[in-house]
């Protein structure tokens, strides 16, 4: 006799974790405007921005020890890393956001 298949839990808005956030005055409208420009819901916009922020923090923490002379890096990776490190923090964030946005478009 075969064992019964167990249902794989599926993600839905009903089963998702919920968290109430108090936004400063005017921020809700700003988020709505940006979400419209990216053709996504406010929830999706907020999630995308939180994910990007968490990824950036994780990447920075994980890659603090990456050296330009590391044998793990290709020539192109060394050049990109060197140029990236020369950018201001604001420019780095903008570049990462641009790359993330392009990746989202490619997946759509």
Swiss-Prot record:
The keyword Repressor applies. One of its GO terms (biological process) is negative regulation of bacterial-type flagellum-dependent cell motility. GO terms for cellular component: protein-DNA complex. The keyword Transcription regulation applies. Changing residue 22 to A: Complete loss of DNA-binding activity. Disruption phenotype: Deletion strain produces no detectable surface pili. Also abolishes mucoidy and algD transcription. GO terms for molecular function: DNA binding; DNA-binding transcription repressor activity; sequence-specific DNA binding; transcription cis-regulatory region binding. Keywords: Activator, DNA-binding, Repressor, Transcription, Transcription regulation. The C-terminal is essential for tetramerization as well as efficient AmrZ-mediated activation and repression of its targets. Forms homotetramers (via C-terminus). This is Transcription factor AmrZ. It comes from Pseudomonas aeruginosa (strain ATCC 15692 / DSM 22644 / CIP 104116 / JCM 14847 / LMG 12228 / 1C / PRS 101 / PAO1). The gene is amrZ.
